[in-house]
């Protein structure tokens, strides 16, 4: 397919920073999203739902970069500015609730055109640092960065891991039998323990069944888990609008799949998933700790993995995070990379502090490793570490 000539008159650049303009470009945005096969995280509906419900709007600004050719939208660089820790960061729009980030590009749009758009976003200012994370190896933004005439941003040391289940099983039962004997036994023991409290049912929530009660239950369980961990998340606050709005986007796209595990009518585990491009993606999960002896989260996971394979899906993606259950069941993992760079002196100083802290930490870890490798008598006499007193 022919690319656009990289002349200014061939395309028009725009930076969207207002609610009104964000709403106006919805149809053109989603048309490009459907053509380009983007994930739901890059859809206009997802970004708009996030922007409408995200808390702390006073500390945020939109920076949605667009490339037009006439009335046709050819590329979208969905960015936003957020203030935290005294700095303004340029990052992906909806980064709070998106596991994978990327640019949307028509095949006819060149890397040079996107580079010009990036330069315009940087020139517009308003931020101290850019930090674009969760970049998949096969993502379009990665390809644009690495192109000879591409953006060429600096890689950052911060990475994340996504865990996935993929294989040549034709049925869920085959996948189950491929698990270790211990894993199969743990599943059966878990179900048996749950059945001591009543009938256990695994089910996919019908599309015509209201999701509200399940989402309320999910939020309650998440708040309890967060409190026990000493953390908070605005997404799960009672009455917070973001979670229902995002789930509604999944439902409207026909992608939503909510799985529940019920014990005598009580929901003991929940997984809010969605299907795209032949992959079942596990977006949000939780379980009731009062039923922990039966491992309801593990039972539900093994049930929906089997369901997914039976439906002909090629992969189950647990998305970001290195939780033990994800690593345990994954057959493959991908590393999500990031880029970072300064725009202001304040940003440069912040990066210098970060790099210095990292260098000091690496040096300390190397020193501890060297000491751990020494015989006990030699380690006791290392400089800076007094030898034990003799008695």
State each model region's role.
Residues 2-15, 19, 81, 142-174, ...:
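Active-site/acyl-donor-binding loops of N-acyltransferases
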Residues 122-140:
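ATP-hydrolysis module of ASCE/P-loop NTPase motor domains
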Residues 12-91, 134-160, 168-293, 389-391:
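A conserved beta-strand-loop-helix scaffold within acyl/acetyltransferase catalytic domains
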Residues 68, 76, 98, 106, ...:
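Aromatic (often tryptophan-rich) hydrophobic motifs at membrane interfaces
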Residues 59-62, 125-127, 256, 311-313:
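Short, high-confidence coil segments that cap the C-terminus of an alpha-helix
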Residues 47-54, 62, 101-114:
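Aromatic/His-enriched, Gly/Pro-containing loop or helix-boundary segments
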Residues 130-132, 203, 317:
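Short catalytic-loop micro-motif centered on adjacent basic/acidic residues
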Residues 91-97, 104:
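Residues forming anionic-ligand binding surfaces in small-molecule and nucleic-acid pockets
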């Amino acid at each position: 397919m022919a690319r656009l000539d990289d002349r200014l008159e061939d395309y028009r650049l725009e930076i969207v920073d207002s609610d009104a303009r964000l709403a106006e470009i919805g149809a053109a945005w989603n048309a490009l999203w459907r053509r380009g096969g983007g994930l739901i995280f890059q859809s206009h509906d997802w970004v708009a739902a996030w922007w409408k419900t995200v808390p702390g709007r006073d500390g945020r600004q939109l920076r949605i970069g667009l490339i037009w050719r006439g009335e046709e939208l050819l590329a979208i660089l969905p960015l936003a500015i957020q203030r935290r820790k005294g700095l303004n960061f340029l990052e992906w729009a909806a980064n709070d609730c998106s596991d994978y980030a990327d640019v949307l590009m028509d095949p006819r749009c060149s890397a040079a055109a996107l580079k010009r758009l990036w330069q315009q976003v940087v020139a517009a200012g308003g931020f101290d640092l850019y930090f674009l994370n969760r970049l998949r190896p096969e993502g379009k933004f990665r390809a644009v960065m690495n192109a000879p005439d591409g953006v060429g941003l600096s890689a950052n040391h911060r990475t994340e891991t996504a865990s996935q289940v993929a294989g040549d099983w034709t049925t869920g039962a085959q996948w189950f039998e491929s698990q270790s004997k211990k894993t199969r036994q743990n599943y059966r023991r878990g179900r048996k323990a749950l059945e001591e409290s009543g009938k256990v049912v695994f089910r996919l929530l019908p599309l015509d069944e209201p999701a509200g009660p399940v989402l309320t239950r999910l939020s309650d369980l998440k708040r309890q888990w967060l409190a026990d961990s000493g953390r908070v998340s605005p997404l799960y606050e009672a009455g917070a609008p973001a979670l229902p709005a995002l789930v509604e986007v999944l439902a409207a796209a026909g992608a939503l799949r909510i799985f529940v595990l019920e014990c005598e009518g009580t929901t003991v585990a929940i997984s809010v998933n969605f299907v795209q491009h032949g992959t079942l993606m596990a977006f949000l999960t939780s379980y009731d700790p009062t039923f922990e002896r039966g491992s309801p989260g593990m039972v539900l996971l093994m049930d929906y993995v089997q369901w997914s394979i039976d439906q002909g899906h090629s992969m189950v993606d647990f998305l970001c995070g290195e939780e033990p259950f994800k690593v345990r069941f994954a057959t493959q993992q991908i590393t999500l990379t990031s880029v970072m760079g300064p725009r202001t002196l304040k940003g440069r100083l912040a990066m210098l502090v970060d790099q210095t802290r990292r260098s000091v930490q690496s040096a300390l870890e190397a020193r501890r490793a060297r000491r751990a490798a020494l015989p006990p008598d030699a380690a006791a006499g290392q400089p800076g570490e007094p030898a034990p007193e003799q008695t």
